[in-house]
Swiss-Prot record:
GO cellular component terms attached to this protein's record: cytosol
GO biological process entries: 'de novo' IMP biosynthetic process
The EC number(s) this enzyme carries: 6.3.1.21
Protein name in the entry: Formate-dependent phosphoribosylglycinamide formyltransferase
Keyword set includes Metal-binding: yes
Function (record text): Involved in the de novo purine biosynthesis. Catalyzes the transfer of formate to 5-phospho-ribosyl-glycinamide (GAR), producing 5-phospho-ribosyl-N-formylglycinamide (FGAR). Formate is provided by PurU via hydrolysis of 10-formyl-tetrahydrofolate.
Organism lineage string: Bacteria, Pseudomonadati, Pseudomonadota, Gammaproteobacteria, Enterobacterales
Ranges that cross the membrane: none
Gene: purT
Metabolic or biological pathway: Purine metabolism; IMP biosynthesis via de novo pathway; N(2)-formyl-N(1)-(5-phospho-D-ribosyl)glycinamide from N(1)-(5-phospho-D-ribosyl)glycinamide (formate route): step 1/1
Database matches in SUPFAM superfamilies: Glutathione synthetase ATP-binding domain-like (SSF56059), PreATP-grasp domain (SSF52440), Rudiment single hybrid motif (SSF51246)
Binding site for Mg(2+): 267, 279
PANTHER family, sorted: FORMATE-DEPENDENT PHOSPHORIBOSYLGLYCINAMIDE FORMYLTRANSFERASE
Length: 392
């Protein structure tokens, strides 16, 4: 039987968030709703989740010794990674010492690295994927591109939000693509994956929950990407019954192989009735922010409920809904927002993340909308997002 202690008391139940951005902030809010003590950690001060946590710490989470020292000092009941840039080998060590890593340390280690999860999916589980090669030098990169053929995509094996990714259509782009991949890796330069292009009708995120009462699926989420990052997402994405069945089977196999309780964002390509695996994150997914308006339990609530060992039961989807990012471009450490009075249309919501500064283009908020159709919901969400003026 689960016992939840009271925050800031001797028997408090403590959650340590490794990563304190907008997704971590929503996880922190769901923890707070259950009276859980939240410790927010990130590499910069005043990150969104830090603003609502009981305590916060600024460390380099790629420094295993610093991470270990902080965990030993705080003694959290649950260590919840919310980003990829973490010393995952140290998480494996901490788990062996008795600490609870969500969903488990091995899942975090494998999915931080595109090579680990791709080899698990394609070579161990036999899941359909794009053609791929790995390279760790410019020479082997060129050989990989030659083997895959044009056009192809290159990505650092460790990166997020499209950083370091390029579409290569000709040999003239190789130098630029290699250098960009080396700049975009989470842990600096290094190994890359070269992938062949996949013919698909659309991409989905299938939020998959592994909980004490089994595997649960949210309705498929469609999304539009630009510059490697999502701009709008919508739920439900319409797809054939056979494709949805195959997607759920694929997601279930991958999630069970990774292990541990929590919510996983499984990214898939869909072409007719065929489904091809792309990636998986063992945590809430940015495209899943639409669930803050589309479901009775958001992806963040589902994640917390699952890793605490609580049953999910069922997830109720309210109907056509969408999200659109608020993505300004400016330089400021004193950001201000205007226009909400006119931007907030009926059946819409706005989330401003509270990021302390902006240097260039940065996702600072999200607009949420519900409507009769997903197409209408997307257009309304985009209109709401465009109505928010960001200055500094």
């Amino acid at each position: 039987m689960l016992t939840i202690g009271t925050a800031l008391r001797a028997d408090a139940t403590r959650v340590m968030l490794l990563g304190s951005g907008e997704l971590g902030k929503e996880v922190a809010i769901e923890c707070q709703r259950l009276g859980i003590e939240v410790i927010a950690v990130d590499r910069y001060a005043d990150a969104p989740a830090m603003q609502i946590a009981h305590r916060s710490h600024v460390i380099n989470m790629l420094d295993g010794d610093a991470l270990k020292a902080l965990v030993e000092a705080e003694r959290p009941d649950y260590i919840v990674p919310e980003i990829e840039a973490i010393a995952t080998d140290m998480l494996v060590t901490l788990e062996k010492q008795g600490h609870h890593v969500v969903p488990c340390a091995e899942a975090t280690r494998l999915t931080m690295n595109r090579e680990g999860i791709r080899r698990l999916a394609a070579e161990t589980l036999g899941v359909p994927t794009s053609t791929y090669r790995f390279a760790d030098s410019e020479e082997s990169f060129r050989q990989a591109v030659e083997a895959i053929g044009y056009p192809c995509i290159v990505k650092p094996v460790m990166s997020s939000s499209g950083k370091g990714q390029s579409l290569i259509r000709s040999a003239e782009q190789l130098d630029k693509a290699w250098n960009y991949a080396q700049q975009g890796g989470r842990a600096g330069g290094g190994r890359v994956i070269v992938e062949g292009l996949v013919n698909f009708d659309f991409e989905i995120t299938l939020l998959t929950v592994h909980a004490v009462d089994g595997i649960h699926f949210c309705a498929p989420i469609g999304h539009r990407q630009e510059d490697g990052d999502y701009r709008e997402s919508w739920q439900p994405q319409q797809m054939s019954a056979l494709a949805q069945e195959r997607a759920q089977k694929m997601a279930s196999d991958v999630v069970k192989a990774l292990g541990g309780y929590g919510l996983f964002g499984v990214e898939l390509f869909v072409c007719g009735d065929e489904v091809i695996f792309s990636e998986v994150s063992p945590r809430p997914h940015d495209t899943g922010m639409v669930t803050m308006i589309s479901q009775d339990l958001s992806e963040f609530a589902l994640h917390v409920r699952a890793f605490l060992g609580l049953p999910i039961g069922a997830v109720r989807q309210y109907g056509a809904s969408a999200s659109a990012v608020i993505l300004p471009e400016l330089e400021s450490n004193n950001v201000r927002y205007q226009g909400l009075e006119s931007a907030l249309l009926p059946h819409t919501q706005i989330r401003l993340f509270g990021k302390p500064d902006i240097g260039g283009k940065r996702r600072m908020g999200v607009a949420l909308a519900s409507a009769e159709t997903t197409e209408d919901a997307v257009e309304i969400a985009k209109r709401v997002a465009a109505g928010v003026t960001v200055s500094g």
